[in-house]
């Protein structure tokens, strides 16, 4: 995720660091431009990229806010069904599950500190986290297209 941000944790095979060992927000990660093309408009974001296992595990844990046009993207390599939870994530988030062609497969709004699982329901190339309600406020819907240079293509 991104000024002070918050993110969900990918659930499933994890690196050696146990989630219980993460006790504070990770420093902001490098950002990259990303665009979302909706029916009405193109929206431009600068999002943090969680590339490593640890960066993906820590995500937006303990972050207090997500900038309006910020967020965090989690590339899924290999491409797979993504399962996220909100363990130690103190703000609610929108999760956009993105296919290899860039289309949004699913959008969910996850509650803060919820250890329930949000799943993509199908193999995806990436998951984008935005502040809760941001997708709806901008009119972003399932089927809209995400353009990001780092999107895994399969």
Indicate residue ranges for each PLM-predicted region.
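Bacterial N-terminal signal peptides
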Residues: 1-13
